[in-house]
Regions:
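Conserved catalytic core of the tyrosine transesterase superfamily
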Residues: 1-293
């Protein structure tokens, strides 16, 4: 890749980070997709054409899922839109190329009983157990993303006032209410946490045995372990607790706009998926009780 292209990609990364306010993971994925396209196609950013674009996308279609293809298209379209914005191009070679249709995937959720079983499976006689219980209660009680839980700071948690300040995608802040179970688990863990704290991550809530912040993989493995101990065989992840949080709120009548705010969704359309999950509940009720079921 020549110096000019490297400079363009560096500027594009800055644009995504600063002007678009995208999350670091999304920025990395977009830049990686664009760099791969330019490298493999041999096209120059200023001269890339639609024919070469279609050829490249066709070559990638067999190796990528529909969802990954859609993200690739989104990254490339965003890149060339930015070049037009900068005055470096007059057209977007992605125009007229359709993104693959993605079926709306309904996320797996846990029942209230399954949530309770997982919570009860944690060994609270050990500091690590108190920490794990606090993580689980905050994932489910506050609907946090795993990345948000791992980067949560003590100075962002206000148990007496009953809320958590969350730094979400694109460094956007939101306030989320903190229920009694989450507050109790948090304060219980905090009483043993200083034994593991190091200066580097002194304000981070959830620490590993070395005193450093827990990684997303560590939380993922902990969630899987506790699910198995609770006798739950379905495949779950930390995100399942977030989905369950939102679904249970909607099922119990919470306003969709409120749920949107608590999840940190930019668009209400993203949150609306939980109305489809709730529809399974009332559909089952209708089929069970209707005389012509």
């Amino acid at each position: 890749m020549d110096k000019n292209t490297e400079t363009i990609l560096k500027d594009y990364r800055y644009y995504l980070n600063v002007e678009r306010g995208m999350s670091p993971n999304t920025v990395s994925a977009y830049c990686r997709d664009v760099a791969s396209y330019l490298e493999e196609s041999g096209e120059k950013p200023e001269k890339a054409g639609k024919e070469a674009m279609e050829k490249y996308l066709a070559s990638r279609s067999g190796a990528l899922s529909a969802r990954s293809q859609a993200r690739l298209m989104s990254a490339l379209r965003s890149f060339f839109d930015w070049m037009i914005l900068e005055g470096d191009r007059k057209d977007n070679p992605c125009d007229g190329i359709d993104s693959p249709k993605i079926g709306r995937h309904l996320p797996d959720v846990l029942s209230v009983d399954e949530i309770d079983a997982i919570m009860k499976s944690v060994d609270l006689s050990k500091p690590g157990g108190l920490r794990d219980r606090a993580i689980l209660e905050i994932l489910y009680g506050c609907g946090l993303r795993v990345s948000e839980a791992c980067s949560l700071r003590i100075s962002d948690v206000f148990p007496d006032e009953g809320f958590v300040r969350v730094i979400g995608k694109g460094d956007k802040q939101r306030l989320v209410p903190m229920g009694e179970m989450a507050k109790d688990a948090f304060t219980g863990y905090l009483s043993v946490r200083p034994m593991a704290s190091t200066k580097k991550d002194g304000d981070i809530v959830f620490l590993n045995r070395s005193g450093a912040r827990m990684s997303r993989i560590s939380v993922f493995n902990m969630v899987r372990k506790q699910a198995l101990l609770a006798g739950i065989t379905k495949t779950i992840s930390p995100h399942t607790f977030r989905h369950s949080f939102a679904t249970h709120l909607v099922e119990n009548g919470a306003d969709l706009r409120v749920v949107q705010e608590m999840l940190g969704h930019e668009s209400i359309l993203t949150t609306e998926i939980y109305t489809h999950i709730d529809s399974k509940t009332w559909q089952a009720a209708v089929l069970k009780h209707h005389p012509r079921k």
